Amino acid sequence: MPRHRSYLLPELVLTAGALLVLVLDVLLPRTQRGLLAWATLGVLAATTIALKPFISAHVEIAHGLIAVDRFALYFKLIFLASAALTVLLSVRYLEVEGASPGEYYFLILCATLGMMFMAGGIDLVTIIVGLETMAVSFYILAGFIKPNQRSNEAAVKYFLLGAFSLGILLYGMSLMYGLSGTTNLRAIATALAGQERDPRLVLAVILVVAGIGFKIAAVPFHMWAPDVYEGAPTPITAFLSVGSKAASFAILLRIFLEGMPTMGPEWRLLFEVLAIMTMVMGNLAALTQSNLKRMLAYSSIAHAGYLLMGVVAGTTRGVSAMLIYLGVYTFMQLGAFAVIVMLRRQDAVSYTHLTLPTIL
């Protein structure tokens, strides 16, 4: 078993790699900046290799702030794979748009770093730090193509609604802390186990569900998703629909299964209602779309409903099924957006026969 201090090696490798990409962006001549994509892929590969010693680990580090276990490892592999595929989708896209690759790839790595801390976080502080690292990176990436008005609008809308949802989530977490006296999820579960039902605790559950509901784009907290998905750069839309959703489900499982198992009847009922509304609304709205990215946005919303069913089950099999579904969804969704990127590269005349004039 590796030493205690080495458990953060993957995160340290990713952080150093992100800084290296920024340095290379300054040092490399403009004609050779295409190498930054390969450097970014190398960083992601090195981070993946750094995870290998911890396959069988099951420990808490940093005074109970972070857990190194198979649950976190599975999500980290999803994040790294989705980031790598996003980089591959972005190479030609950035050339066409004339955008700066160094900052772009740096932000992708920062978003991935935030997701990794979210997956391993077993403390409310760690979860919030990881969540905001990811969110701020996506706010910038959503509006990365500055001349594009829709991209700028998507970034502003995502930022404003994201800040509002964060406030709701923080309020719910502050109630959890106030009622338990700790921010560690497992200590919260222990503290709440002997307490009677408190209306403030029910309010905390509702607020946390609402805050995370925004992040996973569950109905009725989904209104930002279609506009942001449509306006953001296509590779970032792909990464946002996969990486951000997976990371949000990771903290959802951590908070409710580890932090508030005694409130199971309350949060299961809430997630059951959200799952039904999300599946129905997501699929019906997707049928009426004439823009492919908006259609995939509503498809992503519907998939959030399917994933919530595993949470509603609240059993080991339910969670396992949800994790398998999430892994398959990752590659399916990225493949769908890869088709959009491919179509965008082709001569538009080749697609004039399509019956949906605003397909892209």
Q: What is the predicted function of each stretch?
A:
Residues 355-360:
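A short, hydrophobic C-terminal helix/tail in secreted or cell-surface proteins
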Residues 1-354:
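Alpha-helical transmembrane segments of multi-pass membrane proteins predominantly involved
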